Amino acid sequence: MAVDPRVLQQEAEKTLASASKGWGLFGNKEDKYQNAADQYIQAANAFRLQKSNTEAGKCFEEAAKIFTEKLKEPNDAANAMLDAFKVYRKDAPDNAVRCVEVAIKQYTMAGNFRRAASHKENQAEVYENELQNKPEAIKAYTTAAEWYENDGAVALANKLWLKVADLSALAGDFFAAIEKFEKVAEASLGNNLMRYSVKEYFLKAGLCSLATKDMVTAQRNITKYAEKDPSFTGQREYQLLVDLLEAASNNNLEMFQDKLAAYDKMSRLDDWKAAVLLQIKNNFEEADNEFS
């Protein structure tokens, strides 16, 4: 028969109260605090079995509080807060990002930036997916990418720079997106395993350039990409950018749509590209309104 998690929680509360009232002779007080923390963790896991995730998170937080304030065990506290993050993630994402931040600070204070980066990435995912908070997701992904980069984990950093670029573009910050796409493209040019993806990064950077409505800069950027990777000029992605630049420069919406339709038949446009292309299309309509 499964143990009632509320009974375990009450036992933890009683043990904690007993420790707080005791005199601490012969180390008894510290043992009681440790027992209380262990009981809270047992209660948390029992709540998890019942899928009572919010209650589980609260018990993990109580254990972390004891580890921090009574036992002076910051690593144990960080582990408890990570467990709280996991159970809060779906049901209480605001609590999840708060709890994991405590663990992240502990790892950075200890100089363990690789581990901190991994959990900062997890926090960013919650901001992006559960909380739908693009600005905070961008900030968290950026921090994680910087920590990975400083730790020499270039591939992990680049994966997150691409997330920053994607989200920045969807948030309307096309210049920031261009910068990050170009950064990853440059890093990938000298890597045989990553080189195939360069055309995708240049395409995305080029689309963001077109979305800024600055056709002079867009022309310069597209030319720059061809110079950095001459093989890019033989790719469909390059030809699409050239065609869309011509259409945008001449405010030719029909050409824009025809070239997109032709490309889409060969290489299906994903949701991100569709969103940025919609912004470019809207720029055509704004130009029409200015001259009407």
From Swiss-Prot:
Entry keyword set: ER-Golgi transport, Membrane, Protein transport, Transport
Molecular function GO labels: ATPase activator activity; soluble NSF attachment protein activity; syntaxin binding
Gene3D superfamilies: Tetratricopeptide repeat domain
Alphabetical list of Pfam families matching this protein: SNAP
Biological process annotations from GO: autophagy; intracellular protein transport; SNARE complex disassembly; vacuole fusion, non-autophagic; vesicle fusion with Golgi apparatus
Record bears the keyword Membrane: yes
A single GO cellular-component term on record: cytosol
Compartments it resides in: Membrane
Membrane topology field: Peripheral membrane protein
Chief place where the protein resides: membrane
Role description: Required for vesicular transport between the endoplasmic reticulum and the Golgi apparatus.
Recorded family membership: Belongs to the SNAP family.
The protein, known as: Probable vesicular-fusion protein sec17 homolog
